Amino acid sequence: MVYSKTFRVEEKSITVSARGTIGVVFYRDFAYLPAVSLICFVPKEEFDIRFLFHALRAIKFKKQGSATGQLTVAQFKEYGIHVPSLKKQKEIAAILDPLYSFFTDLNEGLPAEIELRKKQLDYYQNFLFNWIQKQKELVEQASTN
């Protein structure tokens, strides 16, 4: 694992917020310009980047410093990560990736799904009550004839 000092990061990498809300971990598979409030990690070959992403997400970072909070590279190194073999890293990432995707999709998709179900409920509720009202009117018409 290396600390990125380049202005533009082209490789797949992991960023961790180091100021304000510290410890927010992002996987980046696109080129970006890192802000000074990020610690950027471009893994060496012995690391599976998705394993590193999940391992970093599992750390409970402690706020240190001013009221804003900060995390320095030196402080970050104190947390340490147990790194299994590359094969085991890939196995762990293969298990955690689908779970992470499921929960991420759930958090993003659930509000939209709830809204669609509300619209569906409104539609069928209106349809059924209108149908009941029409049936009632037909019965009343038939009884008056």
From Swiss-Prot:
The methyltransferase is composed of M and S polypeptides. SUPFAM superfamilies: DNA methylase specificity domain. It holds the Pfam family Methylase_S. Transmembrane segments: none annotated. Keywords: DNA-binding, Restriction system. This is Putative type I specificity subunit S.MpnORF289P C-terminus. One of its GO terms (molecular function) is DNA binding. GO terms for biological process: DNA restriction-modification system. InterPro entries: Restrct_endonuc_typeI_TRD (IPR000055), Restrct_endonuc_typeI_TRD_sf (IPR044946). The C-terminal section of a specificity (S) subunit of a type I methyltransferase (MTase); this subunit dictates DNA sequence specificity. The single R subunit has multiple frameshifts and is probably not expressed. Contains two DNA recognition domains, each specifying recognition of one of the two defined components of the target sequence. Belongs to the type-I restriction system S methylase family. Disulfide bonds: none annotated. The keyword Nucleus does not apply.
